[in-house]
């Protein structure tokens, strides 16, 4: 079940809205790319983030993977981001041997 639904490690998400959740498998880096319709923007909300700082982080990238980002996040409440185009990427990274902390990231595109 680790490669299905919101618990998958990375991939391209084309749904209008959805959720990215904790990945607990063996990979240490996961990148999700959210693609909205051309001309639309992507909105991301992280209601609560409490990762083990120094051992794991989430990075919100404004565009395709490798685009400019808003920094490495390991904690926060009520975090929101908006893309400048129809693409936004989320990277999750953790140190090998460190078990993943739980998180939920919600996204949606404007129509």
UniProtKB/Swiss-Prot annotation:
Transmembrane segments: none
GO terms for cellular component: extracellular region
UniProt name for this protein: Carbohydrate-binding protein AQN-1
Disulfide bonds: 9-30, 53-74
Species of origin: Sus scrofa (Pig)
PROSITE patterns for this protein: CUB (PS01180), SPERMADHESIN_1 (PS00985), SPERMADHESIN_2 (PS00986)
Keywords: Acetylation, Disulfide bond, Fertilization, Heparin-binding, Secreted
Lineage, uppermost ranks: Eukaryota, Metazoa, Chordata, Craniata, Vertebrata
Subcellular location: Secreted
InterPro entries registered for this protein in UniProt: CUB_dom (IPR000859), Sperma_CUB_dom_sf (IPR035914), Spermadhesin (IPR000124)
GO molecular function, a single term: heparin binding
């Amino acid at each position: 079940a680790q490669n299905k639904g919101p618990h998958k490690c990375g991939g391209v998400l084309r749904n209008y809205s959805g959720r990215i959740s904790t990945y607990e498998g063996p990979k240490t880096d996961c990148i999700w790319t959210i693609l909205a319709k051309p001309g639309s923007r992507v909105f991301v909300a992280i209601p609560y983030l409490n990762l083990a700082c120094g051992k794991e982080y989430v990075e919100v990238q404004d565009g395709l993977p490798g685009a400019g980002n808003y920094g490495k996040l390991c904690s926060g409440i009520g975090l929101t981001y908006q893309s400048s185009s129809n693409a936004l990427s989320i990277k999750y990274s953790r140190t090998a041997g460190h078990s993943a902390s739980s998180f939920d990231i919600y996204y949606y595109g404007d129509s």
